[in-house]
Regions:
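Glycine-/charge-enriched secondary-structure boundary and capping motifs
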Residues: 2-11, 26, 118-136, 149-154, ...
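Charge-biased, low-complexity intrinsically disordered regions
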Residues: 5, 10, 14-18, 112
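Short, acidic (Asp/Glu-rich) active-site segment that either coordinates a divalent metal cofactor
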Residues: 155, 168-221
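Intrinsically disordered, low-complexity, positively charged segments
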Residues: 15-45
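Glycine-rich beta-alpha junction loops
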Residues: 66, 162-165, 178, 185-189, ...
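Glycine-rich phosphate/pyrophosphate-binding loop regions near the starts of catalytic domains
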Residues: 33-186
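Short loop/turn motifs at secondary-structure junctions
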Residues: 99-101, 195, 244, 329
Length: 346
């Protein structure tokens, strides 16, 4: 009778799993603060305590998201250390749009074959972004699916939980005359990658090691894997000022109009003025290479505005100053008007 391998259970490599856990421990612990009582690293669940006495009527806000098929670009390039930043940004920036400050984060990593080095790179990016956002990485799951996912490939998702005072949940008090301020996004972030891959890799057969566009000082691969900006830290700084924030929108799939419309009521419109911000060259290259209509580009991509903050006129300068302190550029891109609940670009 053949002696079974001690390292495999139903084709899942237990030894690789153990090695992965050891390699990620320091990264995970680097996100801990005094509120972490126990973590999923050694317990069945992560325990997190926060001082409710800081709040009058605290409300927990949770959001779950992934990185979509940007993971395929990371796999092709064999570069896994930054896409975890995209994951955290996708989640903490979502809950910041409700006014929430992130407390803790959970991740889920599914791979075709457990590779301890790859796992460490993935988690290192998550940990870096969690630390920047002020969220403790209190647990997660590593799952091996050899029959569903090819070796070297992965799927990545996560959940952020934060807290906000009940009377500060956004949106609120939105009114005609409010100013729409857009925060710059130097890259694509983590949405639209099915169209990106179809354009560059399937149709144009572009080399990821070639220039991103004519005269670019970065390769196409480097530009496509560029990590997302975290806007939650910017918003937390704005929330700490006397700026009167009426609404926020995280600009992901659906573009500016498709996301801003989510904060409107049936009596208000959002009018966004094209040409009021700088569009990064990568979007022009996508459109040229794929012969994509303007309307499609506006539906799929952020086109250089990754986040929107809507405030009354007397709060605009405060928002601009805080953005500058965080090395972000704030553009005045539109306004709220009386209407029927539409968001339009003109």
């Amino acid at each position: 009778m053949t002696e079974p391998s001690s390292g495999l259970t139903y084709a899942v490599d237990i030894e690789a799993a153990d090695a992965s856990v050891k390699r990620i421990q320091d990264h995970v612990r680097s996100t801990y603060n005094e509120n972490v009582l126990s973590s999923g690293e050694t317990s069945f669940g992560g325990c997190f305590a926060f001082d409710a006495k800081e709040f009058t009527n605290p409300v927990l806000v949770s959001g779950t998201d992934g990185v979509g098929t940007k993971s395929e670009i990371a796999s092709i390039m064999g570069k896994y250390d930054t896409i975890g930043i995209d994951l955290v940004a996708a989640n903490v920036d979502d809950i910041a749009a409700q006014g929430a400050r992130p407390l803790f984060f959970l991740d889920y990593i599914s791979v075709g074959k457990l590779d301890p080095e790859m796992m460490e790179q993935l988690v290192s990016g998550i940990a870096v972004a969690c630390a920047e956002a002020g969220a403790a990485l209190v647990g997660g799951e590593m799952s091996e699916h050899p029959e569903l996912i090819e070796p070297g490939h992965f799927d990545l998702s996560g959940t952020a939980t934060g807290v906000v005072e009940r009377d500060r949940i956004l949106p609120q008090r939105l009114s005609a005359g409010d100013v729409i301020i857009g925060f710059d996004s130097p890259g694509i972030r983590a949405n639209g990658y099915t169209l990106v891959r179809d354009t560059f890799l399937k149709k144009a057969k572009r080399d990821l090691n070639g220039p991103a566009w004519a005269g670019a000082d970065v390769t196409l691969g480097e530009e496509l894997i560029r990590p997302s900006v975290l806007y939650s830290p910017v918003m937390q700084s704005i929330f700490a000022t006397d700026a009167d924030v009426h609404a926020c929108a995280h600009i992901t799939g659906g573009g500016l109009a498709g996301n801003i419309v989510r904060v409107l009521n049936s009596e208000l419109d959002a009018t966004i003025s094209r040409g009021t911000w700088s569009i990064p060259e990568i979007f022009n290259e996508i459109q040229r290479e794929g012969n994509i209509a303007d309307s499609e580009m506006e539906k799929v991509f952020n086109l250089g505005i990754g986040y929107v903050c809507i405030v009354p006129e007397d709060s605009v300068s405060t928002v601009e100053e805080v953005c500058a302190e965080h090395n972000r550029t704030a553009f005045r891109i539109g306004e709220i008007t009386n209407g029927t609940g539409r968001a339009v670009l003109q």
